[in-house]
Amino acid sequence: MSDRFELYLTCPKGLEGLLAEEAKGLGLDDVREHTSAIRGAADMETAYRLCLWSRLANRVLLVLKRFNMKNADDLYDGVNAVDWADHLAADGTLAVEFSGHGSGIDNTHFGALKVKDAIVDKLRNREGLRPSVEKVDPDVRVHLRLDRGEAILSLDLSGHSLHQRGYRLQQGAAPLKENLAAAVLIRAGWPRIAAEGGALADPMCGVGTFLVEAAMIAADMAPNLKRERWGFSAWLGHVPATWRKVHEEAQARAQAGLAKPPLWIRGYEADPRLIQPGRNNVERAGLSEWVKIYQGEVASFEPRPDQNQKGLVISNPPYGERLGDEASLLYLYQNLGERLRQACMGWEAAVFTGAPELGKRMGIRSHKQYAFWNGALPCKLLLFKIQPDQFVTGERREAQADSGDTHRPLPVASEPARLSEGAQMFANRLQKNLKQLGKWARKEQIDCYRVYDADMPEYALAVDLYQDWVHVQEYAAPRSIDPEKAQARLIDALSAIPQALGVDPQRVVLKRRERQSGTRQYERQATEGRFQEVSEGGVRLLVNLTDYLDTGLFLDHRPMRMRIQREAAGKRFLNLFCYTATASVHAAKGGARSTTSVDLSKTYLDWARRNLSLNGFSERNRLEQGDVMAWLEANRDTYDLIFIDPPTFSNSKRMEGVFDVQRDHVQLLDLAMARLAPGGVLYFSNNFRKFQLDEHLAARYVVEEITAQTLDPDFARNNRIHRAWRLQLR
């Protein structure tokens, strides 16, 4: 074989430039960048060194051959022409990976089979034996990449991906790959800071990936020094003497690096479940003397108390993929920024995030930003210098010069964030509404009400108070609104709400309201299972602010529920599309002879059962699971008081067809009125803003619109929130 080879090094998208610099430093010549890869030329010693030392590559591929191909036969012939006896024993094992498509190969599995067949046939025809396929730890892993009609056939020298260093056997919910973590550290300037003897702190360290990678860089430890099996271990072209030389050189460098006084590298993690897994990872990496992990919140993490010590704070905060997370993340970023200003003066900071707009809430200007990809998710690395002239708030914090006493700042939650002009206007409106509505709510003994409903068009939110919790619903912005501006306004609003309403920031829950299809509005959005008890009109009800799009209590229907309570005494009450049966609880409280509640959702009927039980109601209150239309057609009972509050649109595997309130309301009301006893009353309401009641219903029934009577002061600003009618038999 030649003394020099063409090598391909693959990497995560966005790391090509960094990998090219690293590979040049390790001896790769003629380097060129490609998407998620670089290529160059090297001898075998350099190839080994790249495998051992690259902190950024995924794989090191040694190119065996390039050839043009027009079809599957060309693919077979090109691979079969290689003398595979130079690479693999006839009775050895192999795995094949195929990427790309075209030239008659539109299926990677088919392409891999053709490559495998060509190799097996070559060895069997020559040796009389054939290799077998082993996908996990083969003797040789062959890779073929098809690119615009050219096939690039390679051997994978790495084996398992090089990001798998072997120390991280335990990980958290959303870990960064080790090579991405190393890239972030390099971009953040950690090699320079470490060379100067600087410190490193990660206030949200998870299981310690940043910490271990940082320590390996500082200690001059090859990232894959402890790897025992490589892609070249059983390759017949392997040169053991050269490998031993490279490996022993790396061992000597690591021993020398670890013999130096360790740098101060600390991690802090709020989740106690991650502390021991993180410490185990550090121990497996052999870095227990260098890296320490402690349990602690962002607002309380302590960098080194030595005021002359400089260093890097690095963090990968959560991105907020789950519904309702964005509000809590806003305060997390504010906490992080406040802590940096309080305790890390003169340090540098690096925040790796999939939500860069939240980085603006830290109160520090980012002097440099880099684009990255975390898998398929676009991310940014925000770099900061923690010094007063970079503080957006203009704060100037001077070091305390007391004799040895360290001042510990108050928790961030107690220090209000400075609001932008728009956020202050929004806060003023909230406070004005709260002052007006608070008096009414206290008088009526109501502890759940709406304090804001898109009063200012640029802040398209609904803000509801549930005792000392706040439920925020963001209305979908029109397409004419710039999404970035809408996002900025949302973040402004979220920063203003805790101050204006006097609530704990951690008790603000954000939801996004948009047109819901099918049963999506009823689907579970999270799994916290956090129910809280609220009161209304003398009844106790359970709400859940986090797990579903709606909370279990439609606040706008409060007057209707109170009306039902007043009118229910001695009556048989029917609640259709009952949801969590809050109206049935009010009817039972009002002395109803019986209540029957019908809904398709088992989840909400279980919730309804809990609401009834919470108030001591059970025997006279039936809960029926079923499609309301089908249930009405089959039912022959009569009722004195009926309430119908249907969804605008609904479909389910458990119901026949699709329910559309505009199209189907006449049939629904006719079926329900057939179950109404003489002298009885039916209340019909819905929230479809374009709804029009069929005018022919007035010919059959006594129909009265009562919408204005069903709006309390907290919804008087939005008289289109719902419409309501009272129907009786003629």
Swiss-Prot record:
Quote the InterPro entries the UniProt record gives: 23SrRNA_methyltr_KL, DNA_methylase_N6_adenine_CS, RlmKL-like_Mtase, RlmL_1st, SAM-dep_methyl-trfase, SAM-dependent_MTases_sf, THUMP_dom
Record EC number: 2.1.1.173, 2.1.1.264
GO cellular component labels: cytoplasm
Keyword DNA repair found: no
Main location group: cytoplasm
The record, for SUPFAM superfamilies, names: S-adenosyl-L-methionine-dependent methyltransferases
Keyword Aminoacyl-tRNA synthetase among UniProt keywords = no
User: Which residues belong to any copy of the THUMP domain?
Assistant: 46-157
Q: What GO terms are given for molecular function?
A: 23S rRNA (guanine(2445)-N(2))-methyltransferase activity; RNA binding; rRNA (guanine-N7-)-methyltransferase activity
This protein's UniProt keywords: Cytoplasm, Methyltransferase, RNA-binding, rRNA processing, S-adenosyl-L-methionine, Transferase
PROSITE patterns, alphabetically? THUMP (PS51165)
Question: Cellular location of this protein?
Answer: Cytoplasm
* Record field: transmembrane: none
Catalytic reactions of this protein: guanosine(2445) in 23S rRNA + S-adenosyl-L-methionine = N(2)-methylguanosine(2445) in 23S rRNA + S-adenosyl-L-homocysteine + H(+); guanosine(2069) in 23S rRNA + S-adenosyl-L-methionine = N(2)-methylguanosine(2069) in 23S rRNA + S-adenosyl-L-homocysteine + H(+)
**What NCBIfam families does the database record attribute to this sequence?**
PRK11783.1 (NF008748)
* Function (record text): Specifically methylates the guanine in position 2445 (m2G2445) and the guanine in position 2069 (m7G2069) of 23S rRNA.
Which family, according to the similarity comment? Belongs to the methyltransferase superfamily. RlmKL family.
Q: What protein name is recorded for this chain?
A: Ribosomal RNA large subunit methyltransferase K/L
The scientific name of the source species is Pseudomonas putida (strain W619)
Q: Which gene encodes it?
A: rlmL
